[in-house]
């Protein structure tokens, strides 16, 4: 007699106890890489508001620079679409956060919000507001990130609910 397992969709990745830890490790390593690289300009700058440039992650070279780890490159390849990166255009620590002043911030967009944030076509995947919540964009505009979490937190009770809260990791 064959035993059938329920469909894989019944076991979302976030249901694994190691999921939040894995994502936090990826975010910490990526933030460290950006910091060691001197908080470089974002790739494809989407906007500059109140002196803060917002765009996509710069390309991490596999052969040189701060991001030579194959594990980091693989993780960024897998999760980079959900990340955005912002920095103070003048190089100062113009962003305030619970961790202190920041020259930049690595942003990780949570699951898409119901009824919005399309991410199907290549064009859908470009706008930051298809990944980041309006509260995150407002925090960037005001240069105050203190109200945003700096870690991925998935409490056991909500593992089957959308994890839509964005994460902001300060780059001092």
Can you describe what each PLM-predicted range is?
Residues 1-172:
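Short, surface-exposed interaction loops/tails
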